[in-house]
């Protein structure tokens, strides 16, 4: 904030530089030209300059340090120095530069003049020459006012010389631009009305305002407090001005200053407080001015003459947040006899206390989702060491520097009085630019602060006001006293500044005590709009650049106000820049596609980050400027927009009010239908409404809560965030509009912030506009309210914040607990409660109303202690909380008192808070308007031409000139309550209606005598006539070309406007320019002379026809000749004419001749060999006849077809198949059968008659159609089933002999060791020496191997039956294992009771060796094997294992049993026991079963028998289906709940469609993933039906099932027939292995795949695929087919192993070779 007005005050500040003389008094008069030019010699920017002359009288005490700091160069004594430099330009002169005077030579001491002078020159046109008088130089300069067009004369309307460059339209400067002086380029913008108050015209109709001013033309000075300042004995309405004491009376009585334009002069001065002034002060001022802090003051002379800090620009340094508002002002009051210490601009500022809290925030990312976590540290208080040293406070890992200097242009304050400047700036405040400078080494080093401190740190800057603690502990702000807090801290930490206050004065005395003999004046901050005690969190300190995604800043795009997901909506109608859109109302921006706006746009500064607050945009690296949102089209629909600082205001039209987002005006009130309808909680992808609520609701109640669709037509609810959603849910999700809430029909104001003008009928609420970027842990904040007397009976509240654990010890406090996110109290802001439906924050600044404090609430009363003997009164505040009405009740020892809200006062008669009539009690309220009192507030009713001020306390004039085109092309002059239009620009004239109208210069014929005159707004242009016209008196007349000879030969000429056209004769066509006729080549058209030849002629053509054609009557076509008119053509047929010829269509049996002119008979017997096959053909006239032999018959096509004798039933018998042959048949008998003697049947062959069929290794067993060989042990039947072959155990059992060589023998095998001195041990599978015993073990023998232990080797999936993966062979075989090995290479364990078992397990089953090996010396150390520990859950699955000695026990749950082979607890099927459910339907469940009885039978007491109740006499039909309640939910304790309402179902319907239990007995339904559920609900297991065939072969493995297609089970009510369960089906046993369906004829069974229907028994029986299909096709290749229930499986033959093909086994040798080949590859 300080940096902005210091830029404007540099020229004044330069004049205050000290010289080496001591005690000199110098008076210097400067002519100050307000403008943005800073450096000496800079040219002033465009705009209407208004000069002011200030006289500054300084009493400076020079010192050596100050003289050496920055004294300018000295001049020779007596030689006057040049102060100004004038340059001539059209229209007047302008001040180009201002140079500070050199210091004069030393002179004798002169009497000092007290104070300083600063006042504007009332003359307005000063003109004086420099003069020197007694060491006092006065420079006066006259700066005439420039014209609005830049000082030049008015531009000529018609310029002969064409301008070049940009902004040129039609040979002249575009509208809004003019020529720059001394050039022919249109580069000077024009602002109409001109920029006022020293503003700069940046581009047409865009003014860059000076600090402290605002508006479209900078015509409005920053808003000030309407309350009058108190100057000693002055009345509240008296005016005063800033100046030295002796000039105060003059300024008060002078009226010339009021006639001057409202320009805010900017000056920087140091007011020195003298102990004993030599000149007496006027009586109006009894106190002296206390010196300000090191920050300079921007003084705005407003109408109330109040001194306010009102920045338009503010320093955009990193870390600035909190409640400081650019809209806020700091009014100052002169208060007498206040106890405060004087503060001066020096290093003697006393001790300063800084209270801050460090926080450490980290980002944790898990699986692509990141979240912030912040941990707050302890609150730390630091106090500076002394007033002379730099204010550098140091804590652990933190370095805090307090700086009073406003370092500019990215400079950093390293100590109290030193700025470390960037490389391109210099000076004490880094205010002087340096051109072409290189980066010094010191600055290069400063860019890496981490290296200087030894660790990486972050530099943060916080600009905060300096407060002083008074006697009562109230924090008093000194608005001019603003300090910069520089904090260097680790990068992962952030700093929260709580308090920056002064402890004692410059001499060490405490601020609570006043020094005797001093009359002091203190500055006290009044409660102003949007200002409160600083309590902000500064986080996100890392310098991370945030840039816009579009590189070109001038690129225009569309601004979107809503962004939902990846969709952008609510676009403004016009185009805007990204920085204007994203800095104000936009959430996304783009042209072809939208891009989300960054959360906080940032730009790099020097060693810090510059961030602009919302509503502002960057001007340069150190300053941010307000964005005029009203320049964005459509920002205030249905309303008028007014720009404010950092925001804007919308005045809604009558009948409109603000929407919940405060971004537009919507019809007021919204029409919400009260119609009720069904509310649906879910909408499926097919747009079907589901899950309706039980009651009907309105659309608002439905869509604003849980509904997704509403109404009888399933209307989808609008998405949250859309305009349709806001219309029916203005309060957002979860809130509805009640009937009592209706907006008042007044003008509403909509904006980005709380800027509405409404009554103040509730407590003040503070609004935070800058939340911390990183989420922090929210903690409760205690709001402590204090009171400090400002005068008799006047108290002013202040709000301070402190941590919950640190309370301020005061007895007259009222402490209120505020949770995070709740509105906090702040003085000077009047709001209404935040209703969920209308979250509108209304603000207005009203005149200060005294807050009455009851005398009972003082400290003395509050500290009274009630004695134990006293009787306390009833607490009225507790009994009746609303006893005070609009106020807060405070109980007292006697009765109670009320602290009333703003706008109310306490009435002693009514004992409650009553409304204050501000209209009668407050003077000068609602000036220029009418005041209307309201409950708790008031309203200002403004007449036409006026509007309510931002504070809502006065009616201010509406500047109609700010509206575009209000005067057309003229100049608008605003008046009080109205406006008028003055002179017009060149090319325009004033109408009687007061508007500027364009002059049509083209009405004068002499304007363009030989050219065409084109009128344009404000100008005209002479344009040469185009071809076909000639110029005459400013018009272009047509030339008649048809009068010229040889025009349009072979055609007629028609004159046109500016041209002519030819109408050509027949046979000719116009050329493309329509000015000539040329011949048409008709032969190129393609549709002439068809079937002939076309020849083009001049203007026509000629046709020559071919054979069979003749010329048409029009002679343009060749017509066909109809030859069929001759009757003798085409005998035995019909004549058909064709193009150019004819065709004979002959009758059947005839064909056309070679020439096609007659019909001939066809001899079918010679030409068609396919006729009369297997017979004799006889040709006839036009046809033929066939004669067939025996065994054939003639068909309709006259072909001899074979007679199929196999169609006769019983032919070839059941063991044969009839095969039809040509003219006969043949019986094909099945294998094992032969044809009978007559050849019509098949007889069985007895293969066992031949004794050599099964040789000597088995015996023969004859079967029907075949035989089988029953082989002895060690032999097996081959694939063809004939004979018995030896089983090669060495190939079948891999590794059966271990390390020995396996030798196959007839019927058995031998294990032979390679060494003759060794013998094979079947126990260990190893070859051992014959001299050693099994117990002798070599010392070097390795430890016994550990492999996998297997169980249940008879299972097809035996490789998966692993008990334990790492056990010895004895641990496996001596316990529960049956096989031992690795990777399914299994060594079978010896059988219990054999010698091999005794050798391996000498102690018996259940005992294993105690050592690491089974061959310890002695072999006697054995222990009991803990099978439960050794095998874990595998030995007792689904049960509890208990080890015993020897062995173990497996305890299963009730209803289950233990399978010792599969080592698992399985469900016990109680339904196998007929006594479990007699005369009922038994349904097995996991661990239990259910017994269901058919209606009307019920269960008896034992629940195992269905009996008929004695009282029932109903006749029961077999087809009745029993229905009962269906329970939708079953708890973990098996308690049924939530019965299906309105419907009774069968057991199947309940379990398959609706619930989890059924019936009054709460019969449990099977689990959804169980086989019982699939069987109950008829869910196919295999998925789809498949036909038999080679492609339908399933895998040999039992676990293999073909991949099932996805299937969808429809709801029961959509099925064409109902699927019924056993108790509902009319068929016995309920179609087991199939589904029972109800058809019109009754019931039938739909069998599953693998079963077929036996119609005799009406049951589904298994299909034996191995018998019925294996004869037709080989189901198993090199494998044996084994039938299973509903399917079959293939088991590989010995010597074969499974392959990757289904049902195919490959030889073992081939498989091994393939594995070797794959290993080699």
Swiss-Prot record:
GO cellular component: collagen-containing extracellular matrix; endoplasmic reticulum lumen; extracellular matrix; extracellular region; microfibril; protein-containing complex
PROSITE patterns: ASX_HYDROXYL, EGF_1, EGF_2, EGF_3, EGF_CA, TB
Chain intervals for the UniProt region annotation (C-terminal domain): 1507-1721
Segments carrying motif Cell attachment site: 1174-1176
Compositional bias (Pro residues): 99-111
Effect in UniProt of substituting residue 1366 to A/Q: Abolishes N-glycosylation at this site without affecting ability to interact with the Latency-associated peptide chain (LAP) regulatory chain of TGFB1
Tissue/organ expression: Expressed in the aorta (at protein level). Isoform Long: Expressed in fibroblasts.
Residue list for modification (3R)-3-hydroxyasparagine: 974, 1137
Subcellular location: Secreted; Secreted, Extracellular space, Extracellular matrix
Cystines in this chain: 191-201, 195-207, 209-218, 403-413, 407-419, 421-430, 559-581, 568-594, 582-597, 630-641, 636-650, 652-665, 679-702, 689-714, 703-717, 704-729, 877-889, 884-898, 900-913, 919-931, 926-940, 942-955, 961-972, 967-981, 984-996, 1002-1013, 1008-1022, 1025-1036, 1042-1053, 1048-1062, 1064-1077, 1083-1094, 1089-1103, 1105-1118, 1124-1135, 1130-1144, 1146-1159, 1165-1177, 1172-1186, 1188-1200, 1206-1218, 1212-1227, 1229-1242, 1248-1260, 1254-1269, 1349-1372, 1359-1384, 1373-1389, 1374-1401, 1471-1482, 1477-1491, 1526-1550, 1536-1562, 1551-1565, 1552-1577, 1625-1636, 1631-1645, 1666-1681, 1676-1690, 1692-1705
Extent of Low complexity compositional bias: 64-81, 112-130
Residues in EGF-like domain copies: 187-219, 399-431, 626-663, 873-910, 915-956, 957-997, 998-1037, 1038-1078, 1079-1119, 1120-1160, 1161-1201, 1202-1243, 1244-1281, 1286-1328, 1424-1466, 1467-1503, 1621-1657, 1662-1706
Signal peptide: 1-23
A single BP term in Gene Ontology: establishment of protein localization to extracellular region
Keywords, ordered alphabetically: Disease variant, Disulfide bond, EGF-like domain, Extracellular matrix, Glycoprotein, Growth factor binding, Hydroxylation, Phosphoprotein, Repeat, Secreted, Signal
Renumbered residue ranges of the record's region 8-Cys3 region: 1344-1411
Domain TB, first and last residues per copy: 557-609, 677-729, 1347-1401, 1524-1577
Region (Disordered): 64-158, 228-259, 750-811
Subunit structure: Interacts with TGFB1; associates via disulfide bonds with the Latency-associated peptide chain (LAP) regulatory chain of TGFB1, leading to regulate activation of TGF-beta-1. LTBP1 does not bind directly to TGF-beta-1, the active chain of TGFB1. Interacts (via C-terminal domain) with FBN1 (via N-terminal domain). Interacts with FBN2. Interacts with ADAMTSL2. Interacts with EFEMP2.
Family statement: Belongs to the LTBP family.
Domain notes: The 8-Cys3 region in the third TB domain mediates the interchain disulfide bond interaction with the Latency-associated peptide chain (LAP) regulatory chain of TGFB1.
Protein task: Key regulator of transforming growth factor beta (TGFB1, TGFB2 and TGFB3) that controls TGF-beta activation by maintaining it in a latent state during storage in extracellular space. Associates specifically via disulfide bonds with the Latency-associated peptide (LAP), which is the regulatory chain of TGF-beta, and regulates integrin-dependent activation of TGF-beta. Outcompeted by LRRC32/GARP for binding to LAP regulatory chain of TGF-beta.
Protein's name according to its UniProt entry: Latent-transforming growth factor beta-binding protein 1
């Amino acid at each position: 904030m300080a940096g902005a007005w210091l830029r404007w005050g540099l020229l004044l500040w330069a004049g205050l530089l000290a010289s080496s003389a001591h005690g000199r008094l110098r008076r210097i008069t400067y002519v100050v030209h307000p403008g943005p030019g800073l450096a000496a010699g800079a040219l002033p920017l465009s705009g209407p300059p208004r000069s002011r002359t200030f006289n500054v009288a300084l009493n400076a005490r020079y010192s050596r340090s100050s003289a050496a700091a920055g004294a300018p160069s000295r001049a020779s004594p007596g030689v006057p120095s040049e102060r100004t430099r004038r340059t001539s330009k059209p229209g007047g002169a302008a001040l180009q530069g201002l140079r500070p005077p050199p210091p004069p030579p030393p002179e004798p001491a002169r009497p000092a003049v007290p104070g300083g002078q600063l006042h504007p020159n009332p003359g307005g046109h000063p003109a004086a020459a420099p003069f020197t008088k007694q060491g006092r130089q006065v420079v006066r300069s006259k700066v005439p006012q420039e014209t609005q067009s830049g000082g030049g004369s008015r531009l000529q309307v018609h310029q002969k010389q064409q301008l070049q460059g940009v902004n040129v339209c039609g040979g002249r400067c575009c509208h809004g631009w003019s020529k720059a002086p001394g050039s022919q380029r249109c580069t000077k913008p024009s602002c109409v009305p001109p920029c006022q108050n020293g503003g700069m015209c940046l581009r047409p109709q865009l003014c860059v305002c000076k600090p402290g001013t605002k508006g479209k033309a900078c015509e409005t000075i920053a808003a000030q407090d309407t309350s009058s300042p108190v100057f000693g004995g002055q009345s509240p309405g008296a005016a005063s001005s800033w100046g030295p004491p002796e000039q105060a009376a003059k300024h008060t009585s002078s009226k010339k200053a009021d006639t001057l334009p409202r320009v805010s002069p900017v000056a920087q001065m140091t007011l020195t407080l003298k102990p004993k002034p030599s000149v007496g002060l006027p009586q109006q001022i009894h106190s002296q001015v206390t010196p300000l802090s090191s920050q300079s003051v921007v003084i705005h002379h407003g109408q109330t003459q109040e001194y306010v800090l009102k920045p338009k620009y503010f320093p955009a340094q990193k870390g600035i947040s909190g409640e400081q508002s650019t809209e806020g002002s700091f009014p100052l009051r002169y208060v007498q006899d206040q106890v405060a210490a004087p503060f001066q601009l020096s290093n003697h500022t006393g001790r300063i206390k800084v209270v801050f809290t460090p926080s450490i925030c980290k980002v944790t990312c898990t699986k692509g989702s990141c979240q912030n976590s912040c941990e707050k540290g302890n609150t730390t208080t630091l106090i500076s060491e002394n007033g002379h040293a730099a204010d550098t406070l140091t804590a652990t890992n933190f370095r805090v520097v307090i700086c009073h200097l406003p370092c500019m242009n990215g400079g950093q304050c390293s100590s109290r009085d030193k700025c470390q400047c960037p490389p391109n700036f210099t000076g004490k405040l880094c205010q002087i630019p340096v051109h072409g400078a290189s980066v010094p080494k010191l600055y290069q080093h400063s860019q890496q602060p981490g290296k200087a401190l030894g660790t990486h740190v972050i530099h943060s800057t916080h600009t905060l006001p300096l407060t002083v603690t008074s006697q009562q502990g109230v924090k008093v702000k000194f608005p001019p006293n603003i300090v910069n807090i520089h904090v260097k801290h680790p990068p992962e930490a952030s700093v929260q500044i709580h308090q920056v206050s002064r402890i004692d004065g410059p001499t060490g005395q405490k601020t609570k005590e006043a020094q005797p003999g001093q009359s002091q004046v203190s500055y006290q901050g009044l409660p102003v709009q949007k200002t409160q005690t600083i309590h902000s969190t500064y986080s996100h300190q890392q310098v991370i650049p945030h840039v816009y995604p579009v590189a070109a800043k001038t690129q225009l795009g569309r601004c979107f106000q809503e962004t939902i997901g990846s969709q952008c909506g609510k676009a403004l109608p016009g185009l805007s820049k990204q920085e204007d859109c994203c800095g104000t109302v936009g959430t996304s921006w783009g042209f072809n596609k939208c891009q989300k706006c960054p959360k906080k746009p940032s730009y790099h500064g020097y060693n810090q980050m510059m961030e602009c607050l919302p509503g502002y945009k960057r001007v340069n690296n150190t300053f941010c400027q307000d964005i005029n949102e009203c320049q964005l089209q459509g920002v205030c629909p249905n309303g008028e927009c007014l720009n404010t600082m950092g925001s804007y205001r919308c005045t809604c039209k009558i009948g409109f009010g603000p929407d919940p987002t405060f971004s537009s005006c919507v019809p007021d009130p919204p029409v919400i239908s009260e119609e009720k309808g069904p509310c649906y909680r879910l909408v499926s992808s097919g747009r079907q409404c589901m899950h309706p609520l039980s009651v009907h609701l309105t659309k608002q109640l439905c869509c604003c809560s849980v509904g997704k669709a509403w109404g009888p037509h399933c209307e989808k609810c609008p998405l949250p965030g859309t305009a349709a959603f806001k219309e029916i849910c203005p309060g957002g999700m979860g809130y509805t509009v009640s009937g009592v809430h209706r907006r008042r029909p007044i003008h509403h104001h909509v904006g980005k912030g709380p800027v509405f003008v409404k009554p103040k009928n509730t407590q003040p609420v503070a609004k935070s506009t800058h939340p911390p970027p990183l989420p922090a842990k929210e903690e409760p904040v205690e709001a402590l309210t204090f009171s400090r007397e400002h005068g008799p009976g006047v108290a002013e509240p202040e709000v301070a914040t402190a941590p919950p654990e640190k309370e301020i010890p005061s007895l007259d406090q009222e402490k209120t607990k505020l949770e995070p996110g709740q509105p906090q109290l702040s003085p000077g802001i009047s709001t209404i409660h935040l209703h969920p439906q209308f979250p509108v924050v209304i603000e207005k600044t009203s005149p200060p109303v005294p807050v009455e404090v009851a005398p009972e609430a003082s400290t003395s009363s509050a500290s009274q202690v009630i004695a134990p003997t006293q009787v306390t009164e009833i607490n009225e505040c507790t009994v009746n909380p609303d006893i005070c009405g609009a106020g807060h009740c405070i109980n007292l020892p006697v009765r109670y008192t009320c602290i009333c809200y703003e706008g109310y006062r306490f009435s002693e008669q009514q004992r409650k808070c009553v409304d204050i009539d501000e209209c009668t009690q407050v003077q000068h309220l609602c000036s220029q308007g009418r005041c209307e009192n309201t409950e708790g507030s008031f309203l200002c009713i403004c007449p036409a031409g006026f509007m309510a001020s931002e504070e809502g306390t006065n009616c201010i004039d509406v500047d109609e000139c700010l509206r575009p085109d209000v005067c057309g092309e003229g100049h608008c002059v605003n008046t009080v309550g109205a406006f008028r239009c003055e002179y017009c620009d060149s090319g325009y004239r004033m109408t009687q209606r007061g508007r500027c109208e364009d002059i049509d210069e083209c009405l004068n014929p002499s304007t363009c005598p030989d050219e065409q005159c084109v009128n344009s707004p404000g100008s005209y242009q002479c344009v040469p006539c185009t071809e076909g016209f000639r110029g005459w008196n400013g018009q272009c007349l047509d030339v008649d070309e048809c009068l010229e000879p040889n025009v349009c030969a072979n055609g007629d000429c028609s004159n046109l406007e500016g041209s002519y056209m030819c109408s050509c004769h027949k046979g000719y066509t116009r050329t493309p320019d329509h000015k000539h006729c040329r011949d048409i080549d008709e032969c190129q058209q393609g549709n002439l002379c068809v079937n002939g030849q076309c020849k083009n002629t001049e203007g026509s053509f000629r046709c020559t026809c071919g054979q069979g054609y003749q010329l048409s009557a029009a002679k343009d076509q060749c017509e066909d000749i109809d030859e069929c008119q001759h009757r003798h053509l085409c005998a035995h047929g019909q004549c058909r004419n064709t193009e150019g010829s004819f065709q004979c269509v002959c009758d059947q049996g005839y064909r056309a001749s070679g020439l096609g002119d007659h019909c001939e008979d066809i001899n079918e017997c010679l030409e068609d060999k396919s006729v009369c096959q297997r017979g004799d053909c006889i040709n006839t006239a036009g046809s033929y006849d066939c004669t067939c032999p025996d065994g054939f018959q003639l068909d309709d096509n006259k072909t001899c077809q074979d007679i199929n004798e196999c169609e006769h039933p019983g032919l070839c018998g059941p063991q044969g198949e009839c095969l039809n042959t040509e003219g006969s048949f043949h019986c094909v008998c099945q294998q094992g059968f032969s044809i009978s003697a007559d050849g019509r049947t098949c007889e069985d062959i007895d293969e066992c008659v031949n004794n050599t069929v099964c040789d000597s290794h088995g015996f023969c067993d004859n079967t029907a159609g075949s035989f089988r060989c029953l082989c002895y042990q060690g032999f097996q039947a081959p694939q063809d089933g004939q004979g018995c072959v030896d089983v090669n155990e060495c190939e079948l059992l891999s590794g059966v002999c271990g390390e020995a060589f396996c030798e196959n023998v007839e019927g058995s095998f031998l294990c032979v060791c390679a060494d003759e001195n060794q013998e094979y041990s079947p126990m260990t599978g190893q070859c051992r020496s014959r001299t050693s015993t099994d117990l002798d073990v070599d010392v070097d023998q390795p430890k016994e191997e550990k492999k996998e232990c297997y169980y249940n080797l008879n299972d097809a999936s035996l490789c998966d039956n692993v008990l334990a993966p790492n056990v010895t062979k004895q641990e496996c075989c001596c316990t529960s294992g049956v096989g031992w090995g690795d990777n399914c290479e299994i060594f079978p364990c010896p059988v219990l009771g054999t010698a091999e078992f005794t050798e391996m397990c000498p102690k018996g089953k259940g005992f294993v060796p105690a050592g690491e090996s089974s061959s310890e010396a002695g072999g006697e150390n054995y222990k009991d094997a803990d099978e439960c520990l050794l095998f874990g859950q595998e030995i007792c699955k689904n049960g509890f294992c208990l080890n015993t000695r020897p062995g173990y026990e497996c305890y299963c749950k009730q209803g289950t049993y233990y399978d010792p082979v599969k080592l698992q607890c399985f469900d016990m099927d109680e339904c196998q026991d007929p006594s479990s459910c007699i005369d009922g339907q038994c349904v097995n469940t996991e661990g239990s079963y259910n017994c269901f009885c058919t209606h009307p039978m019920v269960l008896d007491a034992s629940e195992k028998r269905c009996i008929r109740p004695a009282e029932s006499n109903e006749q029961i039909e077999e087809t009745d289906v029993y229905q009962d309640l269906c329970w939708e939910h079953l708890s973990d304790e098996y308690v049924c709940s939530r019965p299906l309402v309105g419907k009774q179902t069968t057991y199947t319907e309940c379990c398959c469609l609706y619930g989890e239990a059924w019936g009054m007995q709460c019969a449990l339904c099977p689990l959804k993933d169980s086989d019982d559920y699939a069987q109950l609900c008829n869910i196919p297991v295999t998925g789809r039906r498949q036909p038999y065939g080679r492609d339908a072969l399933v895998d040999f493995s039992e676990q293999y099932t073909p991949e099932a297609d996805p299937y969808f089970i429809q709801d029961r009510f959509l099925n064409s027939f109902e699927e019924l369960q056993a108790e509902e089906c009319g068929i016995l046993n309920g179609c087991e292995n199939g589904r029972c369906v109800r058809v019109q004829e009754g019931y039938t069974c739909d069998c599953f795949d693998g079963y077929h229907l036996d119609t005799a028994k009406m049951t589904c029986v298994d299909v034996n695929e191995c018998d019925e299909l294996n004869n037709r096709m080989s189901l198993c290749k090199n494998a044996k087919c084994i039938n299973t229930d509903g399917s079959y499986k293939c088991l590989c033959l010995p010597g074969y192993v499974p392959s990757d093909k289904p049902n195919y086994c490959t030889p073992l040798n081939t498989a091994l070779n393939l594995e070797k080949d794959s290993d080699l590859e």
